[in-house]
């Protein structure tokens, strides 16, 4: 039964608010995976370890992590046998950000600063004058066992700032502002004057190992937050993050104003669709495929890592699930029967820069997820994969849009072409429309969350039947 206008808006906003929770709990890729892990465990998925043997059973649900920054979750259909296909949705856990250098201790004209490195292709000017903090992981040595352990850290208050230079000292700042990423993107942590007032005159003598690399006040903040002593911290991987939470906005609360929508929007929709598709035991019981979500780290820097889409991770997992002594070519048989949605955000047409889009391909808010096509294979979509997803979308009532870039414009890429070429897998590139991609604060629409989630859930439930009607190799 169709929902009335009010009920539909309530459903749209409820789903969008769940995305807000997901984003606010995920200030780094490590936190993304921790949040996904928590949701999967709550939904009855069982954790696997790559280093152990697996006993994969139909109608059961599993997940594994690598580097604590990539996660793969899958549910095995009740009718699955080795050689059957995989229904996959892939996305990425990382977003452009600034990351703390291994030796971050910097001081200039009385300010204590933190040296940072750019990660990905961020719009770095948007990081100025923001209330920034730190999130990520530290590796500690347990004083009792001597083991190396990981701890997640997220200091939930502003501790860092990158101030703009006053316009009086740079009159052309509104015409030409391009910060030098090595010199101008160094956040302020504290002043030396205040540190002396807080601590008193420091004792002369050699600095400790961590104090040589990082300011003592930074280490003190981290240790206080984690309840650790400074000498227990071996290494750190820390991202800078905005402390302003993700929110709904606009006169009708139809917009999502948030950090890291590229690509936490897709991560959330993919993961929740997998969980929701398994909520009915009957749905999974009659599925001949394996439903799978693959969320990779390091997409924003090329995916060439042990936990990235360029690695052997996906192939190894698919091979382990397919393995059968009675059917030695099960993996090779499964790949042509499989399909992946490469889920990554799409550029909505901008009201102030509409000429940047090709005139017949201008995605709008509220009009559905966007199929992304590029003849130069920057996206992996083709006529076959597009037709199959259109069939699914039609059955679940989700509208679709199209995006092709102008001939005189560069085109980004995704994990789609990587996995299509690496596995020989049929792939479609698709994403929800957004504005301000790679800004510290991005913009999407509330409708896009429910539309994308509905499409993804429909894909998991319907793809096996849709694929049986495909007469193309």
UniProtKB/Swiss-Prot annotation:
Q: What is this protein called?
A: Aspartyl aminopeptidase
**How would you summarize where this protein is expressed among tissues?**
Ubiquitous.
Record gene name: Dnpep
Show the InterPro entries listed in the entry.
Answer: Peptidase_M18, Peptidase_M18_dom2
Superkingdom, taxonomy of origin? Eukaryota
Q: Which UniProt keywords apply?
A: Aminopeptidase, Cytoplasm, Hydrolase, Metal-binding, Metalloprotease, Phosphoprotein, Protease, Zinc
Query: What is the annotated role of this protein in its UniProt record?
Result: Aminopeptidase with specificity towards an acidic amino acid at the N-terminus. Likely to play an important role in intracellular protein and peptide metabolism.
Task: List ligand-binding residues for substrate.
Answer: 168, 299, 344, 347, 372, 379
Q: Which NCBIfam families match?
A: PRK02813.1
The entry sums up its family as follows: Belongs to the peptidase M18 family.
Species in which this protein is naturally found: Mus musculus
Where does it reside? Cytoplasm
